[in-house]
Amino acid sequence: MEGVYFNIDNGFIEGVVRGYRNGLLSNNQYINLTQCDTLEDLKLQLSSTDYGNFLSSVSSESLTTSLIQEYASSKLYHEFNYIRDQSSGSTRKFMDYITYGYMIDNVALMITGTIHDRDKGEILQRCHPLGWFDTLPTLSVATDLESLYETVLVDTPLAPYFKNCFDTAEELDDMNIEIIRNKLYKAYLEDFYNFVTEEIPEPAKECMQTLLGFEADRRSINIALNSLQSSDIDPDLKSDLLPNIGKLYPLATFHLAQAQDFEGVRAALANVYEYRGFLETGNLEDHFYQLEMELCRDAFTQQFAISTVWAWMKSKEQEVRNITWIAECIAQNQRERINNYISVY
């Protein structure tokens, strides 16, 4: 019966998203891409997929890896915004929550660029389109966190996430900006998790709790590893940065905060089945991407669930990374590495 009510508000959206999912590149299509000799061949192969003639305005002479990435990403943003424009109520709020993470990245990027005297226009070009907000360009005038909040961020959706940041930064330097960014992400993920738990019905609720829990775990592991290089981050500060959700929470999260070396981090993960072998072999980011894609693929097995929006979005982002990787290998004639992409569909 919940399917009947779901379809009243969200049936069209889920249908569109599942159509997008069916347009994701298959293993056979990836194999065809890896056999291309030039970027022009790659463009031709992509034209027979859902990407169609998205590069038709780009001449062979000006075709580059960065242009392919830019145009593929632009297609993703257009499709996401189309879905968001069709949504309302809690589904619209859910779509908005997805964009908050990109907003946090944009804020950190703008502040970092400003303190290093980078060109404002250049920084704005690097900002993520889905994380754009009206006052973003004015971030470059802020000299400290308080003025940043009062003049720019107080009217944005990120404002509630700043309440635990003001005791962190006396001045805005690279270290403090990264600490602020991680605190914002922690508050954001926990808030998103609570929203999903309270507002989103099953089966989407369980799917999103799993996906957000994974996102929190990935951040926790990366923070634990990166903090090993800094003597300024003690266990108490580290605890303030690690999200209180996910498979790692609470026991492994506590041990990650206490870890002083690589062995300590590995020991903290040893009792968590999903991440047990992540630090043993291969590239850590590749392990994360692989697991994320498997979770997203599984999310599509559920019907009447807006969690498919998140699963499609993350799958599409991985697809853009894959295409960019293949294009870069072709451009640099690194044929032996061209198959190091991640595909689960």
From Swiss-Prot:
GO terms for cellular component: fungal-type vacuole membrane; Golgi membrane; proton-transporting V-type ATPase complex; vacuolar proton-transporting V-type ATPase complex; vacuolar proton-transporting V-type ATPase, V0 domain. GO terms for biological process: endosomal lumen acidification; Golgi lumen acidification; proton transmembrane transport; vacuolar acidification; vacuolar transport. It is a peripheral membrane protein. It comes from the Eukaryota. The keyword Chaperone does not apply. One of its GO terms (molecular function) is proton-transporting ATPase activity, rotational mechanism. Keywords: Acetylation, Hydrogen ion transport, Ion transport, Membrane, Transport, Vacuole. The modification N-acetylmethionine is found at residue 1. It is found in: Vacuole membrane. Pfam families: vATP-synt_AC39 (PF01992). PANTHER family: VACUOLAR ATP SYNTHASE SUBUNIT AC39 (PTHR11028). Subunit of the V0 complex of vacuolar(H+)-ATPase (V-ATPase), a multisubunit enzyme composed of a peripheral complex (V1) that hydrolyzes ATP and a membrane integral complex (V0) that translocates protons. V-ATPase is responsible for acidifying and maintaining the pH of intracellular compartments. This subunit is a non-integral membrane component of the membrane pore domain and is required for proper assembly of the V0 sector. Might be involved in the regulated assembly of V1 subunits onto the membrane sector or alternatively may prevent the passage of protons through V0 pores. V-ATPase is a heteromultimeric enzyme composed of a peripheral catalytic V1 complex (components A to H) attached to an integral membrane V0 proton pore complex (components: a, c, c', c'', d, e, f and VOA1). Present with 1630 molecules/cell in log phase SD medium. Belongs to the V-ATPase V0D/AC39 subunit family. This is V-type proton ATPase subunit d. It comes from Saccharomyces cerevisiae (strain ATCC 204508 / S288c). The gene is VMA6.
